[in-house]
Amino acid sequence: MRNNFSKFTKAFTSMTCFSVILISNNSELAANYLIVNKEEINKNKINLKNTTHLSNDPLLTFDLDKKNGLLIVDNGEKNSEQNVLISEIIIEGWEDHPEGRKLELAAYDSMNINPGSIINNQILKDNLNSIYASGWFSGVKIKSQDGPLGVRLIISVVPNPILKKVKLNPKNTIIPNKFVDDIFTNYYGTTLNLNELQNRINLLKKWYEEKGYSLSRINGPERISEDGVVSLNVDEGIVSDIELRFLGSDGEPNVDGKPRKGKTKDWVIKRELKTIPGSIFNRKILEADIKRLYATSLFDDVKVSLGPDNSNPGNVIIILDLSEQRTGNLTGGLGYSNSSGIFAQIGLQETNALGRAWSTNINLNFGEHSTTYNFSLSDPWIKGDKHKTSFRTNVFLSRDYPQEFRSENNGRIYAVNDTTTASTDSLSSIVLEKTGGGFSFSRPLNGGDPFKDSKWRVLAGMNFKSVKMIDSDGKKKPYGDKTPTTGNINEIICIGYTPKDGSCPSENTLVSFIGSTSRNNLNNKINPTSGNKFSLGSEQFVSMGNNSPTFNRMRATYAFFIPTKLINLTKGCKSSDVANIDCPQTIGFEFKAGTILGELPPYEAFCMGGPSSVRGWSSCDLSVSKSFVEATAEYRFPVWRMISGALFADFGSDLGSQDDVPGKPGKLLQKSGSGYSLGGGIGVKTPIGPLRLDIASKDLSGDWRYTLGVGWKF
């Protein structure tokens, strides 16, 4: 027996693994703790003879190698595979810890060796790694002692402290303190476990990722203090600068070695960016910024790249490569409308005037019943205004044959000189020559945040115009008569405003203040399938003299849409997903109402009938009234690919107010005043809305009307 034990002892003394083994933190959460003094491990190899705190170990001829974060014994001999019997395992170092017994058991549970196990160097290293991998300890030291029954292993552990607080550096991080506290509060007062700490740090990282802060990094802990305070360094990814580069047709940003100059001013571009220098990089915010740049219609392409800021490590520079599109357009064409008849149109438009995103438009329209010259200028966002206020102004000159004095089947009212008619009077059509202009300011109710998606919008402005009552030859004719050769004075009306003295001026001056508010909650502005829209407006005309009326015109509109799937003609509609975007099928309802208070010129009355009203009648052929109500129900559904269909019902009523219009032109022309129409239509999808052909009946009388237009009625 003694001989066998001697052999065992001899074999043990030649082993490489049982002098001293140290484990240090090799995780990113490590506090960089080592049991060995820093001066002792500044070299790859440390001779244990110079390590005083290990002098009691029976093996002093071994060197200590540092490999992969582990400190292991090596005497240069390849004998790590020799097996040794373990007689006893003792864990110490936990005794003074508040949760010491728990940590002792955790250390034992982490090991898969027990007294009586036969192990070698590799098995021992694996067990040491398991102890450290438990996350409860910042350091592990193992000593071996030769005993009468085998090798005694003494494992000295350095427990992590009781966690008291987790701090983020810097203190002004964007992540809410409450969110951090919610993650760690129930963890405070327990022993710090590096694995659990990592899991909770991952929750912080997930918050940054979900919010779009894709460049944010959490490093640490930078240190773990003895009193249990963990400090985490947060690098949120600050944007140092935003560089703009304009690309030419060749895709290059430089010309002759110099940066290419763009037409659009830098501040016009950067005001669309919520991302600014000094802000934290956010992928979602930057994506929204790019969408806003595209929405300006100033750019064909916008490319984004990120570069490092060499002067501020950890910060980034955003580089935007912009391809500007041509913003000047010359348009022209022929067309037909109920109000203008056959017309020719020519226009010149510039949507980026002076590089400030101003839109200017010169439009000339020559029609069968109307001629218009119009110039307009609009600024989509007044420079420096945080409310994103827009401005629009226009001036115009027009001559038109007013629809209020025409009827499709009951003739028209002709222009006459005075209340005395004769058979020699020519049958001249009424012509209104209008000269004027106006301006308006509009803004979303965003609370001063230009990037807030606001559903409400308000508008205020003024309009000015001078209206002359003439005939087609330009002669002043302020009166109108349906049958100018009859001499029936009861049928002669004043075309314009009639003052209290009973006169009939040949020219009116109209000055008005306008105000409106609207709310748009539609899911799609061009082809809505759900949501609602509301608008309310008022225009107050003020008198500027004897020929200038005072009255108020109010109008309200409300529409809403209900998504449905009643007809399943396309593949997308056959899907079980009711909200499938490939099946834009909906039932929409629209309600309109309006009234006028005060004395108005007849040509300022409400008109009903036409493509945007009750579709079974031509424009203004249903009524000329002082008040009105309209209602429409429309079912829209896809038919095949880009083709869609619609079934609708329209209704309108003047509420008996045609008699309240001065001169009663609607009554003279025997306009119905109320009516309904049923019909259907078909549309072809285009970027600005469907090209639509509608067929509508007039009170189911068998009289059908065909209308062609762009975009849905509402």
Language-model features, listed with the residues they occupy:
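Classical Sec-dependent N-terminal signal peptides that target proteins to the secretory pathway
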Residues: 2, 6-32
